[in-house]
């Protein structure tokens, strides 16, 4: 039998059957409940894969640390191709997942959004740095000296989500879609 694309309805039916076999009740959270679930998950993880694409159409993916403020993601970085891409195209995608070996334990979120880059002269940079302060303090404690970055080296990327898809199979949440208003 040849492979084919399944409709959303067909995929939902297959998912429901799988969850039923695992004795997990499927849940369909409201937008507000889904936002709370996603924020809770974002607050518990720290690394994400950030995907960007410039005018040349060549995608770039970078594994970076992040902090969140609600559903908004902040990334602290020194440079790289991702910044060139974001100058040409402010659309970004983020993948965050919990590594599992079983279907039952799958948990993660895929985010599409608009990215903004802030340098030291921007208000957004100071705000992002404040959000990263606990991480910097912890790192300074680990290495025993203050962290200092050369002026102009570091930037903050803020990704404001437009669409998200969330999974938390143990809770019965699968393929839960969120869209900005």
Q: Which sequence ranges carry the predicted segments?
A:
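Short beta-strand segments
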Residues: 45-79, 86, 93-98, 107
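Short Pro/Gly-enriched beta-strand edge/turn motifs at strand-loop
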Residues: 44-49, 137-141
């Amino acid at each position: 039998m040849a492979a084919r694309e399944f409709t959303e309805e067909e995929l939902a039916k297959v998912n429901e059957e799988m969850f039923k076999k695992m004795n997990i009740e499927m849940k369909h959270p409201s937008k507000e409940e889904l936002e709370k679930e996603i924020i809770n998950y974002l607050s518990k993880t720290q690394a994400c894969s950030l995907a960007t694409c410039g005018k040349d159409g060549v995608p770039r993916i970078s594994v970076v640390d992040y902090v969140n403020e609600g559903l908004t993601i902040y990334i602290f970085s020194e440079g790289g191709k991702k910044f060139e891409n974001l100058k040409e195209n402010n659309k970004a995608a983020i993948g965050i997942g919990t590594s599992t070996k079983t279907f039952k334990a799958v948990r993660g979120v895929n985010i599409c959004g608009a990215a903004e880059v802030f340098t030291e002269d921007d208000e957004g940079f100071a705000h992002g740095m404040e959000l990263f302060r606990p991480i910097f303090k912890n790192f300074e404690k680990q290495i025993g000296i203050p962290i200092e970055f050369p002026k102009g080296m570091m930037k903050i990327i803020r990704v404001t989500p437009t669409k998200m898809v969330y999974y938390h199979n143990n809770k019965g949440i699968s393929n839960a879609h969120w869209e900005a208003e």
